[in-house]
């Protein structure tokens, strides 16, 4: 999770987030190189007394500044498209979790099991236990198994919401009347926090998301207790 004075992203806890971090570094390096080149050219123009006011045609220069941007765009577009297809690809998920956004809480339903659904509200400050995080703790955490492909079905009962867990690289809009889907898979156990990322009313900032990812053995034990 994020911590005070943090610079950069949270630690990646899913293959998708790892790919997004690599893509961010890749794109940032390209931006850095372009910025350095532009600053170098500007410094040369300001420091030299020579000017080319009589230049009427420069075919080589025009060719370079046409081809080079095209190559740069291709270098950005190809890995971006690869990640885009990875995020949309859902092959034989192990289970499905349906999420509905409300003003101002989330409700969850494990569609593979009968009568396993609950609402998840933020725990108010007076009710926090020692060690709980203010404005991030909920009364009912989502328990899921690690290292398994999970299909998320996300929608809303009222207004626009957005179900977001940064460490897992997930941000999917919850739209009334529309069912969006996303893939969730973690590489390690842990507790991951998120929040609604679409302004949805006066209590928009009080819609935390808490996922508790556990090994399959412990998930099955929790499942038996909940059913």
UniProtKB/Swiss-Prot annotation:
A Pfam family annotated for this UniProt entry: COX2_TM
CDD domains, A to Z: CcO_II_C (cd13912)
Main location group: mitochondrion
Catalytic activity: 4 Fe(II)-[cytochrome c] + O2 + 8 H(+)(in) = 4 Fe(III)-[cytochrome c] + 2 H2O + 4 H(+)(out)
Co-factor requirement: Cu cation
Magnesium is among the record's keywords: yes
Source superkingdom: Eukaryota
Protein name: Cytochrome c oxidase subunit 2
Species in which this protein is naturally found: Nycticebus coucang (Slow loris)
Gene label: MT-CO2
